[in-house]
């Protein structure tokens, strides 16, 4: 747990400006990217497809995830000294850690610089994902081990308030990986990945847990688990901006699924469509996984990460021999069916996170892992232009020093 005086000391360094080369054309969005406990801010030049590092802050432990307030005035970050950000690629055992927290920041409307507000909140275990509800009234946090959820009120000034008591025992599945709230603010989705089988035990079954949501209070509603959750390891989901379609990334299966949403927000029990995310599914390697996904703001395309890396006996990351790409799909606007139209090489390894800028003219992929010195592949931010047909054109990459921690999270946030 971090003391308030230490957090205040961290706050003093939030506005520290790092040296930079040339100021790009102004952008109404900023990119934030972590390297361990450091969270760096980059200015975006959309016309030149360029990033300029401007400042950074340091959190008490490795950044796990972050999410903006709907007003875009505030920004929330969760951190932990446990979990996969402290482990080698493919590791079967990861530290649980002792320092887990949630912090609130005010976003400078001109520059995107972050200023801490209020006191950080200690969390019970490693947070793996977080989001803010559509009303901007509550922040929801998902934990993978033990799989669980907490909700905190947000105060009028954007700072974090008290925990919201839940009235009953929540069905939080096995290995929660993402928590999202629908646009109507009435339904919460907890994506629980489960775990793949090992030589000693069968798989832990995956599911998408669905809760009713009333101002931060959750109530069990449904569990979506085709085939009883067997061979079903969902990681992340996203929503179509105008149609009642939910898109789901299956990690171990390297699949994209589409579900219909009823008027009350409940997904169908089985997918409408299931598609392969890899360019050549027959060549799938041992450490090949699907990652996060994002629907284009116009609803015509969806993007999904494919990830591959392994570690040697010393824990150093190596090329997994598989595919590190962003899969691009065109979405049929009448049926919701996705058609794979491109697998764009990310020019790095393990693109754990990626984001589109608000204009959807750029996509930036955060290649998490630096491969061994022999292979000479650095962790990096890879920048792509987005064509009108949804396909990606690689422009350049910016290496990220991960000597003190991996590029575990990055995102692009529109300024207030």
Model regions and ranges:
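Residue-level detector of Asp-centered blade-edge/turn motifs that repeat once per structural unit
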Residues: 25-27, 70-72, 132-136, 182-185, ...
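Short, solvent-exposed loop/turn segments at conserved positions within beta-propeller repeat blades
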Residues: 33-35, 85-100, 142-147, 197-206, ...
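Short loop/turn segments immediately following the C-termini of beta-strands
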Residues: 34-36, 80-82, 144-146, 154, ...
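Short loop/turn segments immediately following beta-strands, especially the blade-tip
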Residues: 42-49, 105-112, 151-160, 210-218, ...
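A short beta-strand motif characteristic of beta-propeller blades
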Residues: 52-58, 115-121, 163-169, 219-227, ...
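Conserved beta-strand position repeated across blades of beta-propeller domains
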Residues: 67, 131, 180, 238, ...
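Asp-box/WD-like beta-propeller blade repeats and closely related beta-sheet repeat scaffolds
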Residues: 113-183
């Amino acid at each position: 747990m971090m003391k308030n005086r230490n957090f205040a000391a961290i706050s003093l360094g939030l506005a520290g400006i790092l040296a930079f080369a040339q100021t790009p054309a102004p952008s109404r969005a900023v990119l934030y990217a972590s390297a361990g406990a450091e969270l760096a801010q980059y200015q975006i030049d959309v016309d030149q497809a360029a990033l300029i590092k401007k400042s950074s802050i340091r959190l008490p432990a490795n950044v796990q995830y972050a999410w903006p307030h709907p007003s875009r005035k505030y920004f929330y970050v969760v951190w932990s000294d446990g979990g996969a950000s402290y482990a080698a690629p493919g590791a079967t055992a990861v530290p649980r850690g002792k320092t887990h927290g949630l912090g609130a920041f005010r976003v400078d409307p001109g520059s995107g610089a972050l200023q801490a507000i209020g006191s950080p909140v200690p969390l019970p275990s490693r947070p793996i994902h977080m989001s803010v509800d559509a009303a901007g009234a509550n922040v929801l946090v998902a934990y993978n081990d033990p799989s669980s959820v907490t909700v905190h009120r947000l105060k009028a000034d954007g700072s974090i308030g008290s925990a919201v008591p839940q009235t009953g025992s929540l069905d939080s599945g096995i290995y929660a990986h993402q928590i999202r709230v629908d646009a109507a603010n009435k339904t919460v989705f907890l994506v629980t990945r489960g775990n793949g089988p090992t030589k000693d035990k069968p798989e832990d079954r995956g599911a998408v847990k669905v809760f009713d949501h009333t101002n931060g209070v959750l109530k069990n509603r449904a569990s979506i688990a085709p085939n009883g959750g067997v061979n079903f390891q969902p990681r992340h989901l996203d929503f179509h901006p105008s149609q009642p379609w939910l898109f789901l990334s299956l990690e171990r299966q390297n699949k994209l699924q589409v579900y219909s949403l009823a008027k009350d927000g409940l997904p169908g029990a089985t997918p409408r469509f299931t598609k392969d995310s890899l360019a050549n599914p027959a060549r799938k390697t041992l450490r090949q996984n699907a990652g996060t996904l994002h629907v284009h703001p116009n609803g015509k395309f969806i993007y999904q990460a494919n990830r591959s890396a392994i570690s040697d006996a010393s824990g150093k990351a190596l090329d997994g021999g598989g595919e590190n790409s962003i899969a691009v799909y065109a979405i049929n606007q009448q049926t919701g069916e996705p058609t794979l139209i491109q697998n764009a090489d990310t020019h790095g390894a393990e693109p754990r996170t990626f984001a589109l800028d608000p204009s959807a003219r750029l996509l930036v992929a955060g290649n998490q892992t630096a491969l061994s010195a022999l292979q000479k592949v650095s962790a990096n931010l890879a920048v792509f232009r987005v064509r009108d047909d949804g396909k990606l054109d690689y422009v350049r990459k910016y290496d990220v020093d991960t000597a003190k921690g991996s590029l575990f999270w990055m995102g692009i946030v529109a300024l207030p």
